[in-house]
Each structure stands twice: as C-alpha cells, then as structure tokens.
Amino acid sequence: SVRILNYVTQNGVRLTFPVTSAVIENSIIFGGNAEELELGQDTTSSADYNVLITNTLIKGKKLETPNFVDCHWAKSQNIRNASDTVFVNTNIDNIAETGYFNFRLDSLSHARNLGSVSVSTLYPLDLDGKDRNADGNPDLGAYER
C-alpha cells in the first residue's frame, strides 16, 4: 500500500506539512487490499502537495485527477483472489511448495510493456541486471519479463 498525505492528526489536532515532490514512475501498486493507494491533501492549508504518478499499475478505484498520467487501474477489486495479481507467486497458502513470494511478472501480467522508455532509460537494469529496454517495451515494476 501507498499513502501520500500532507497532514496528520495527533491528539485531535490536524497538522499539515508540505509534500514538495512525490514521484512514482513505471511502478506497480498492488496488494491484498481492495484499495492500495491513498492520496490525501488538506485543502484548508497552503501546504504544498506535489504528487505525480505515471505509467503505474494501481489496484484501487480509478481516480480522475491531474496527479495520474498514463496509469492503468486493476480490473478486479477482489481482495483474496490471487489471480488479480500480476506476479509469478504472491499466494501465501502455498509457500511450502512454491517457495516465498516471487514478484517477477507473470507471463500474462497486465504490467508487461506498459513502462515509459524515458524512465527506463534512467534506470536501465532491473533487480536481476536484465536490460529493461532490450525489447523496446519496458515492463512496470522491479523486474523485466
């Protein structure tokens, strides 16, 4: 889950603080909750709130704000349905047989070929050292398929 807020409430008092720059690119925001992303801006204060999310697969209700550019929203909101995932293995029920979670993209993943080439040029290698730009269509997330 990801929460980006420019406020917090402590002891019944709302405190605001600036979010001067929060940028998420070529990423996957996915998990076991129906809503995996929360953006919150205190509109009663003048605290900065500069959030940009681009070329990202998000599990949650589609939000229509300028904060999102070329984002893709997960089709299903079923909390426990493992087929909603875009990864090879995130099913905790079969850990003994399958090994631990595998966050590499599944062959049918919705996150394949959706990345921005300009972003992947800045970060050309995935966590395995694989070239994200080899096929000209970078994938979202930490691993290139």
Question: What kind of region is each of these model predictions?
Answer:
Residues Q77-R145:
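C-terminal accessory segments
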Residues S1-F103:
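Predominantly extracellular beta-rich ligand-binding scaffolds that present long acidic/polar faces
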